[in-house]
Curated annotation (Swiss-Prot):
This is 5'-nucleotidase SurE. Belongs to the SurE nucleotidase family. It is found in: Cytoplasm. The gene is surE. It catalyses: a ribonucleoside 5'-phosphate + H2O = a ribonucleoside + phosphate. GO terms for molecular function: 3'-nucleotidase activity; 5'-nucleotidase activity; exopolyphosphatase activity; metal ion binding; nucleotide binding. Its cofactor is a divalent metal cation. Keywords: Cytoplasm, Hydrolase, Metal-binding, Nucleotide-binding. The lineage of its organism: Bacteria, Pseudomonadati, Spirochaetota, Spirochaetia, Leptospirales.
Length: 250
């Protein structure tokens, strides 16, 4: 299988290195990643600016851009052969609930899904800077080898792995997205006249405890796998909204 590997933590991160180290033993791996940290960039693309792309060798490229840029170049820049799977991660920190809308890790995988590729985003609860993510990468290898034939193109598969996990398929749970809320705060520094630098901070207010969610699985020590649809239409109100507007217009 030809696997494009990217992330939002940057080319130097241990998570992406672990995936390549493990997967290249059995698959053709093509690594293309941002030059630096690009967390919380979702599916941002460099539309109006050029990007500097550095070729290390035929299988390794560095992009001064966003994670979705990396996927786009990898798929359409004529640098790699035809890609079968877009793999984003391993992210340092989880992406669950509302996080998926902001995450550059999930955004990169979503861009692959839009272009009709198998797409998997992988995040870990282990945020230690010196952690190597080899155990997580081994689990990803097992998952890909056993289940890639059952996955659908056009779907983003979002996997979150607890820091203390059992590496077996019996420990995997298929889940739905939960909900997480944050209290956002900003601090101001370097204030000169009416100009200041704003820094985002804050804390988590809470997350869902509903059974069947990614949060419930993760915090019970299970690996969560959530299929994310590209179609974000809210079908629960579609007919009601259409009928309501039709009555008002007529």
């Amino acid at each position: 299988m030809n696997i494009l590997i990217t992330n939002d933590d940057g080319i130097a991160s241990s998570g992406i290195k672990a995936l390549e180290t493990i997967l290249q033993k059995e698959h053709n791996t093509y690594l293309i990643a941002p030059l630096r940290e690009r967390s919380a960039t979702s599916m941002a693309l460099s539309i109006y600016d050029s990007m500097r792309v550095e070729r290390i060798n035929d299988n390794h490229y560095i992009v001064d851009g966003y994670p979705a840029d990396c996927v786009n170049i990898g798929l359409h820049g004529e640098i790699f052969p035809k890609i079968d799977l877009v793999l984003s991660g391993i992210n340092r920190g989880v992406n669950m609930g509302h996080d998926v809308h902001y995450s550059g890790t999930v955004g990169a995988a979503r861009h692959g899904a839009i272009h009709k590729k198998l797409s998997l985003a992988v995040s870990s609860g282990n945020i230690a800077k010196d952690y190597d993510y080899i155990r997580e990468a081994e689990f990803v290898r097992k998952f890909i080898n056993e289940y890639s034939s059952q996955l659908k193109v056009g779907v983003v598969y979002n996997m979150n792995i607890p820091s203390d996990f059992i590496s077996s398929m019996e420990n995997l749970r298929v889940t739905k997205l939960g909900k997480r809320t944050y209290e956002d705060t900003y601090s101001q520094k370097n204030i000169i006249g009416g100009i200041a630098d704003f820094y985002l901070g804050g804390s988590e207010l809470g997350h869902s405890t509903e059974e069947g969610t990614d949060f419930t699985a993760f915090f019970s020590g299970k690996i969560s796998l959530t299929p994310l649809s590209l179609d974000q239409t809210d079908f629960s109100i579609l007919t009601q909204l259409s009928d309501s507007l039709s009555k008002n217009i007529s």
